[in-house]
Protein backbone atom coordinates (compact mmCIF):
# COMPACT_ATOMS: atom_id res chain seq x y z
CA UNK A 1 0.00 0.00 0.00
CA UNK A 2 1.17 3.51 -0.71
CA UNK A 3 1.68 6.16 1.88
CA UNK A 4 -1.50 8.02 0.81
CA UNK A 5 -3.64 4.90 1.25
CA UNK A 6 -2.14 4.32 4.66
CA UNK A 7 -2.92 7.91 5.63
CA UNK A 8 -6.52 7.58 4.44
CA UNK A 9 -6.92 4.30 6.30
CA UNK A 10 -5.44 5.82 9.40
CA UNK A 11 -7.77 8.82 9.18
CA UNK A 12 -11.04 7.24 8.03
CA UNK A 13 -10.86 3.49 8.80
CA UNK A 14 -12.16 3.73 12.38
CA UNK A 15 -15.24 5.76 11.41
CA UNK A 16 -16.15 3.47 8.51
CA UNK A 17 -15.75 0.37 10.71
CA UNK A 18 -17.88 1.89 13.46
CA UNK A 19 -20.63 2.80 10.97
CA UNK A 20 -20.64 -0.69 9.45
CA UNK A 21 -20.74 -2.36 12.88
CA UNK A 22 -23.55 -0.07 13.99
CA UNK A 23 -25.57 -0.90 10.88
CA UNK A 24 -25.07 -4.62 11.38
CA UNK A 25 -25.76 -4.60 15.12
CA UNK A 26 -28.88 -2.40 14.89
CA UNK A 27 -31.34 -4.96 13.45
CA UNK A 28 -29.80 -7.77 15.51
CA UNK A 29 -30.36 -5.89 18.76
CA UNK A 30 -33.95 -5.12 17.81
CA UNK A 31 -34.60 -8.81 17.06
CA UNK A 32 -33.10 -9.88 20.35
CA UNK A 33 -35.34 -7.44 22.25
CA UNK A 34 -38.39 -8.61 20.40
CA UNK A 35 -37.56 -12.28 20.99
CA UNK A 36 -36.85 -11.73 24.71
CA UNK A 37 -40.17 -10.08 25.48
CA UNK A 38 -42.39 -13.04 24.63
CA UNK A 39 -40.13 -15.36 26.65
CA UNK A 40 -40.47 -13.21 29.72
CA UNK A 41 -44.18 -12.91 29.24
CA UNK A 42 -44.47 -16.65 28.67
CA UNK A 43 -43.09 -17.44 32.12
CA UNK A 44 -45.33 -14.90 33.91
CA UNK A 45 -48.60 -15.39 32.01
CA UNK A 46 -50.72 -18.50 32.42
CA UNK A 47 -51.42 -20.88 29.56
CA UNK A 48 -54.94 -19.58 28.85
CA UNK A 49 -53.64 -16.11 27.97
CA UNK A 50 -50.96 -17.15 25.53
CA UNK A 51 -52.98 -15.82 22.60
CA UNK A 52 -53.11 -12.39 24.14
CA UNK A 53 -49.39 -12.41 24.71
CA UNK A 54 -48.74 -13.41 21.14
CA UNK A 55 -51.03 -10.64 19.84
CA UNK A 56 -49.26 -8.08 21.98
CA UNK A 57 -45.93 -9.29 20.71
CA UNK A 58 -47.13 -9.03 17.13
CA UNK A 59 -48.40 -5.50 17.82
CA UNK A 60 -45.04 -4.55 19.21
CA UNK A 61 -43.33 -5.98 16.14
CA UNK A 62 -45.63 -4.02 13.86
CA UNK A 63 -45.12 -0.82 15.86
CA UNK A 64 -41.37 -1.24 15.71
CA UNK A 65 -41.59 -1.80 11.95
CA UNK A 66 -43.71 1.34 11.61
CA UNK A 67 -41.18 3.30 13.64
CA UNK A 68 -38.40 2.08 11.39
CA UNK A 69 -40.38 2.97 8.28
CA UNK A 70 -41.32 6.39 9.69
CA UNK A 71 -37.67 7.05 10.54
CA UNK A 72 -36.63 6.08 7.05
CA UNK A 73 -39.47 8.06 5.46
CA UNK A 74 -38.81 11.18 7.52
CA UNK A 75 -35.63 11.75 5.57
CA UNK A 76 -37.60 11.97 2.27
CA UNK A 77 -39.57 15.13 1.44
CA UNK A 78 -42.11 15.03 -1.39
CA UNK A 79 -43.36 18.41 -2.72
CA UNK A 80 -46.39 18.50 -5.03
CA UNK A 81 -47.04 21.80 -6.81
CA UNK A 82 -50.80 22.47 -6.51
CA UNK A 83 -50.81 26.25 -6.89
CA UNK A 84 -48.79 29.31 -7.80
CA UNK A 85 -45.33 29.59 -6.39
CA UNK A 86 -45.40 32.51 -3.98
CA UNK A 87 -41.61 32.74 -4.03
CA UNK A 88 -41.72 34.04 -7.62
CA UNK A 89 -42.65 37.59 -8.58
CA UNK A 90 -44.79 36.50 -11.55
CA UNK A 91 -47.26 34.71 -9.30
CA UNK A 92 -47.93 37.94 -7.40
CA UNK A 93 -48.52 39.81 -10.63
CA UNK A 94 -50.97 37.19 -11.84
CA UNK A 95 -52.90 37.44 -8.57
CA UNK A 96 -53.02 41.23 -8.80
CA UNK A 97 -54.15 41.13 -12.42
CA UNK A 98 -56.83 38.58 -11.54
CA UNK A 99 -58.11 40.91 -8.83
CA UNK A 100 -58.10 44.04 -10.98
CA UNK A 101 -59.69 42.37 -14.02
CA UNK A 102 -62.88 41.56 -12.16
CA UNK A 103 -65.18 44.58 -11.65
CA UNK A 104 -67.83 44.32 -8.95
CA UNK A 105 -71.42 44.74 -10.00
CA UNK A 106 -72.00 47.56 -7.53
CA UNK A 107 -69.49 49.91 -9.15
CA UNK A 108 -70.82 49.15 -12.64
CA UNK A 109 -74.37 49.96 -11.54
CA UNK A 110 -73.16 53.17 -9.92
CA UNK A 111 -71.36 54.23 -13.13
CA UNK A 112 -74.47 53.52 -15.23
CA UNK A 113 -76.61 55.52 -12.83
CA UNK A 114 -74.15 58.44 -12.98
CA UNK A 115 -74.24 58.46 -16.80
CA UNK A 116 -78.02 58.23 -16.83
CA UNK A 117 -78.26 61.09 -14.33
CA UNK A 118 -76.49 63.51 -16.69
CA UNK A 119 -79.60 63.91 -18.83
CA UNK A 120 -81.66 64.79 -15.73
CA UNK A 121 -79.71 68.04 -15.18
CA UNK A 122 -81.95 71.02 -15.92
CA UNK A 123 -80.19 73.95 -17.67
CA UNK A 124 -80.22 77.21 -15.76
CA UNK A 125 -82.45 79.82 -17.36
CA UNK A 126 -81.33 83.41 -17.73
CA UNK A 127 -84.21 84.77 -15.69
CA UNK A 128 -83.43 82.49 -12.75
CA UNK A 129 -80.01 84.11 -12.13
CA UNK A 130 -80.22 86.77 -9.40
CA UNK A 131 -79.48 90.34 -10.56
CA UNK A 132 -76.46 90.68 -8.26
CA UNK A 133 -74.81 87.67 -9.88
CA UNK A 134 -75.65 89.00 -13.35
CA UNK A 135 -73.93 92.29 -12.52
CA UNK A 136 -70.86 90.44 -11.31
CA UNK A 137 -70.75 88.46 -14.56
CA UNK A 138 -71.16 91.60 -16.69
CA UNK A 139 -68.41 93.54 -14.93
CA UNK A 140 -65.45 94.27 -17.16
CA UNK A 141 -61.84 94.98 -16.37
CA UNK A 142 -60.83 98.63 -16.41
CA UNK A 143 -57.54 98.85 -18.29
CA UNK A 144 -56.90 102.46 -17.24
CA UNK A 145 -58.10 102.76 -13.65
CA UNK A 146 -57.57 105.91 -11.64
CA UNK A 147 -54.94 105.75 -8.93
CA UNK A 148 -56.27 105.31 -5.40
CA UNK A 149 -55.18 107.20 -2.28
CA UNK A 150 -56.79 106.29 1.06
CA UNK A 151 -59.62 104.54 -0.81
CA UNK A 152 -60.44 107.54 -3.03
CA UNK A 153 -59.48 108.31 -6.64
CA UNK A 154 -56.53 110.65 -6.87
CA UNK A 155 -58.48 113.08 -9.09
CA UNK A 156 -60.97 113.69 -6.26
CA UNK A 157 -58.36 114.67 -3.68
CA UNK A 158 -57.43 118.30 -3.17
CA UNK A 159 -53.68 118.65 -2.50
CA UNK A 160 -54.39 121.53 -0.12
CA UNK A 161 -56.20 119.16 2.23
CA UNK A 162 -53.19 116.90 2.62
CA UNK A 163 -51.25 117.48 5.83
CA UNK A 164 -47.93 116.41 4.36
CA UNK A 165 -46.71 117.90 1.09
CA UNK A 166 -43.43 116.18 0.36
CA UNK A 167 -43.03 117.89 -3.03
CA UNK A 168 -42.52 121.20 -1.17
CA UNK A 169 -39.55 119.96 0.79
CA UNK A 170 -36.12 121.25 -0.26
CA UNK A 171 -34.38 119.02 -2.77
CA UNK A 172 -37.57 117.12 -3.72
CA UNK A 173 -38.12 116.23 -7.37
CA UNK A 174 -41.59 117.41 -8.36
CA UNK A 175 -41.76 114.89 -11.22
CA UNK A 176 -41.93 112.14 -8.60
CA UNK A 177 -45.34 113.45 -7.52
CA UNK A 178 -46.83 115.13 -10.65
CA UNK A 179 -46.75 113.55 -14.11
CA UNK A 180 -47.08 115.08 -17.58
CA UNK A 181 -45.42 118.36 -16.54
CA UNK A 182 -48.00 119.27 -13.89
CA UNK A 183 -47.17 121.15 -10.74
CA UNK A 184 -49.31 121.93 -7.76
CA UNK A 185 -50.97 124.98 -9.33
CA UNK A 186 -51.67 123.50 -12.77
CA UNK A 187 -52.93 120.28 -11.19
CA UNK A 188 -55.48 122.24 -9.17
CA UNK A 189 -56.67 124.04 -12.33
CA UNK A 190 -56.98 120.70 -14.13
CA UNK A 191 -59.08 119.22 -11.33
CA UNK A 192 -61.48 122.19 -11.27
CA UNK A 193 -61.85 122.09 -15.06
CA UNK A 194 -62.60 118.35 -15.05
CA UNK A 195 -65.19 118.82 -12.32
CA UNK A 196 -66.85 121.63 -14.29
CA UNK A 197 -66.98 119.56 -17.49
CA UNK A 198 -68.48 116.53 -15.80
CA UNK A 199 -71.27 118.66 -14.34
CA UNK A 200 -72.12 120.38 -17.63
CA UNK A 201 -71.77 117.33 -19.87
CA UNK A 202 -75.22 116.00 -20.81
CA UNK A 203 -75.41 113.94 -24.03
CA UNK A 204 -79.19 114.29 -24.29
CA UNK A 205 -79.02 118.06 -23.99
CA UNK A 206 -76.32 118.29 -26.66
CA UNK A 207 -78.37 116.14 -29.06
CA UNK A 208 -81.46 118.31 -28.61
CA UNK A 209 -79.43 121.46 -29.32
CA UNK A 210 -78.06 119.96 -32.53
CA UNK A 211 -81.55 118.99 -33.71
CA UNK A 212 -82.84 122.50 -32.98
CA UNK A 213 -80.00 124.06 -34.98
CA UNK A 214 -80.65 121.68 -37.87
CA UNK A 215 -84.32 122.59 -37.85
CA UNK A 216 -83.52 126.30 -37.93
CA UNK A 217 -80.96 125.83 -40.70
CA UNK A 218 -78.11 127.32 -38.70
CA UNK A 219 -75.68 124.42 -38.99
CA UNK A 220 -74.11 125.79 -42.21
CA UNK A 221 -71.33 128.31 -41.81
CA UNK A 222 -72.62 131.76 -42.86
CA UNK A 223 -69.12 132.88 -43.90
CA UNK A 224 -68.69 130.07 -46.40
CA UNK A 225 -70.92 131.78 -48.99
CA UNK A 226 -73.32 128.84 -49.26
CA UNK A 227 -77.00 129.78 -49.14
CA UNK A 228 -78.94 128.64 -46.16
CA UNK A 229 -81.55 126.10 -47.22
CA UNK A 230 -85.01 126.70 -45.88
CA UNK A 231 -86.40 123.48 -44.61
CA UNK A 232 -90.03 122.75 -45.42
CA UNK A 233 -92.08 121.89 -42.40
CA UNK A 234 -93.89 118.59 -42.86
CA UNK A 235 -97.68 118.58 -42.76
CA UNK A 236 -99.36 117.27 -39.66
CA UNK A 237 -99.62 113.49 -39.54
CA UNK A 238 -102.94 111.83 -40.33
CA UNK A 239 -105.38 110.95 -37.61
CA UNK A 240 -104.50 107.92 -35.53
CA UNK A 241 -100.74 108.07 -36.18
CA UNK A 242 -98.13 109.16 -33.64
CA UNK A 243 -96.70 112.67 -34.09
CA UNK A 244 -93.15 111.36 -34.79
CA UNK A 245 -94.30 109.06 -37.61
CA UNK A 246 -92.79 111.30 -40.25
CA UNK A 247 -89.32 111.05 -38.71
CA UNK A 248 -87.22 113.50 -36.74
CA UNK A 249 -88.00 117.22 -36.86
CA UNK A 250 -86.47 118.88 -39.89
CA UNK A 251 -87.10 115.94 -42.24
CA UNK A 252 -90.04 115.86 -44.71
CA UNK A 253 -92.95 113.50 -44.47
CA UNK A 254 -92.49 110.25 -46.45
CA UNK A 255 -95.36 111.12 -48.82
CA UNK A 256 -93.72 114.40 -49.76
CA UNK A 257 -90.58 112.64 -50.92
CA UNK A 258 -92.53 110.87 -53.67
CA UNK A 259 -94.13 114.15 -54.83
CA UNK A 260 -90.75 115.86 -54.95
CA UNK A 261 -89.32 113.04 -57.02
CA UNK A 262 -92.23 113.23 -59.47
CA UNK A 263 -91.77 117.00 -59.81
CA UNK A 264 -88.08 116.56 -60.53
CA UNK A 265 -88.79 113.97 -63.22
CA UNK A 266 -91.37 116.21 -64.93
CA UNK A 267 -89.03 119.21 -64.88
CA UNK A 268 -86.29 117.12 -66.46
CA UNK A 269 -88.68 116.04 -69.22
CA UNK A 270 -89.62 119.66 -69.91
CA UNK A 271 -85.95 120.59 -70.20
CA UNK A 272 -85.38 117.81 -72.71
CA UNK A 273 -88.35 118.95 -74.79
CA UNK A 274 -87.04 122.51 -74.86
CA UNK A 275 -83.66 121.32 -76.05
CA UNK A 276 -85.29 119.34 -78.84
CA UNK A 277 -87.26 122.38 -79.96
CA UNK A 278 -84.12 124.47 -80.16
CA UNK A 279 -82.42 121.81 -82.24
CA UNK A 280 -85.33 121.73 -84.69
CA UNK A 281 -85.24 125.51 -85.08
CA UNK A 282 -81.54 125.40 -85.81
CA UNK A 283 -82.04 122.76 -88.50
CA UNK A 284 -84.77 124.82 -90.19
CA UNK A 285 -82.62 127.94 -90.20
CA UNK A 286 -79.75 126.05 -91.78
CA UNK A 287 -82.00 124.71 -94.53
CA UNK A 288 -83.32 128.19 -95.34
CA UNK A 289 -79.83 129.59 -95.57
CA UNK A 290 -78.80 126.87 -97.99
CA UNK A 291 -81.77 127.59 -100.26
CA UNK A 292 -81.01 131.31 -100.36
CA UNK A 293 -77.42 130.62 -101.33
CA UNK A 294 -78.50 128.48 -104.30
CA UNK A 295 -80.77 131.21 -105.67
Swiss-Prot record:
One of its GO terms (biological process) is mRNA processing. Keywords: mRNA processing, Nucleus. Residues 32-46 have a biased composition (Basic and acidic residues). Residues 48-60 have a biased composition (Polar residues). It holds the Pfam family Fip1. The keyword Membrane does not apply. The keyword Membrane does not apply. Residues 1-93 are annotated as: Disordered. InterPro entries: Fip1_dom (IPR007854), Pre-mRNA_3'-end_processing_reg (IPR051187). It comes from the Eukaryota. Residues 1-18, 63-76 have a biased composition (Acidic residues). It is found in: Nucleus. One of its GO terms (cellular component) is mRNA cleavage and polyadenylation specificity factor complex. Pre-mRNA polyadenylation factor that directly interacts with poly(A) polymerase. Belongs to the FIP1 family. PANTHER family: FIP1-LIKE 1 PROTEIN, PRE-MRNA 3'-END-PROCESSING FACTOR FIP1. This is Pre-mRNA polyadenylation factor FIP1. It comes from Kluyveromyces lactis (strain ATCC 8585 / CBS 2359 / DSM 70799 / NBRC 1267 / NRRL Y-1140 / WM37).
Amino acid sequence: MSSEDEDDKFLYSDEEDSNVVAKQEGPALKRQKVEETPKILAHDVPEGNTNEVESEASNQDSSSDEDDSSDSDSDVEIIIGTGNDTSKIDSGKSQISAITDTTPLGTADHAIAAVAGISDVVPVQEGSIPPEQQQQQQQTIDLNPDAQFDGKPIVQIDPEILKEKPWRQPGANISDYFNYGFNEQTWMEYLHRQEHLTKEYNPQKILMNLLALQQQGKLNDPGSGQPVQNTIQPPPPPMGLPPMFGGFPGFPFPGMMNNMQNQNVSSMNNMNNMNNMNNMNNINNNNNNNLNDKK
